[in-house]
Amino acid sequence: METPQPDKTGMHILLKLASLVVILAGIHAAADIIVQLLLALFFAIVLNPLVTWFIRRGVQRPVAITIVVVVMLIALTALVGVLAASFNEFISMLPKFNKELTRKLFKLQEMLPFLNLHMSPERMLQRMDSEKVVTFTTALMTGLSGAMASVLLLVMTVVFMLFEVRHVPYKMRFALNNPQIHIAGLHRALKGVSHYLALKTLLSLWTGVIVWLGLELMGVQFALMWAVLAFLLNYVPNIGAVISAVPPMIQVLLFNGVYECILVGALFLVVHMVIGNILEPRMMGHRLGMSTMVVFLSLLIWGWLLGPVGMLLSVPLTSVCKIWMETTKGGSKLAILLGPGRPKSRLPG
């Protein structure tokens, strides 16, 4: 009579969960260097189509990479210079923001008896401090500037990635046991992420330009800074467009008026409706194959792991993880849970 074997399913699940916790803790601890690598990979993916475009027109790869990287550096240097001046001026005006906010709160206090509210202006000021209102903006800028601090290291990493990208399929063909499956998965991941980042960058650029022109026409101060913020936060799914509208609306409410604040809010709403809800779904479709809930949860998880840069790149990072799961034996079922809608067929076994 054979002795029944104990069920070790629970133990296996606990081991996998423990391994996941260790991996996530390691990623969180090494966030500084991982953010640098992710930014380099982001630039490499976005710039590689330009390099390919030059190569198809007879330009040698080293020359093409040099041209693209130099143009990128010139554009980033000019943008950072303009933003630094605007941001320093904005920081210097924060005391004026507090003073104006205090005046508005004292004016609001006259209405409190009619609203049956009992709160002193000092207490409201503590809750609505303008410095706290722009905390997220400052944290985002600080996170990006900190990640971009080692510009030389970042540029060198991008250059090496652009040189090595053409050799990756050949290396994998010799290194993997089943290269056809893994190369197909890698190709699908790179194609999906490249398509997503290219279109998202283009749509974010349109968003930033339209916001900048609209705010300039309204005479809003720091229009370029708010436009760049809208450009960056457009990478953040679901909540990015809402967050980018809050600081300029508060600024306009304090220094211009309620009517102008409504106009600024309407500008952001129209831009988000047209670009985010009409153009983006039509241009992208469901190429990344993730549900809305998974997109939102990935925003929270990657934001906790890697900070603001993790929030900006949460969708492509989760997409790569999903495609990697689909090419592994034990991860295909979990990949189905990350997908949108109902699965069309059951997995064998």
From Swiss-Prot:
Entry's localization field: Cell inner membrane
Pfam families: AI-2E_transport
Mode of membrane association: Multi-pass membrane protein
Principal location class: membrane
InterPro entries: AI-2E-like
Assigned protein family: Belongs to the autoinducer-2 exporter (AI-2E) (TC 2.A.86) family.
PANTHER family: TRANSMEMBRANE PROTEIN, TRANSPORT PROTEIN YHHT-RELATED
Protein name, UniProt field: Putative transport protein YhhT
Source lineage: Bacteria, Pseudomonadati, Pseudomonadota, Gammaproteobacteria, Enterobacterales
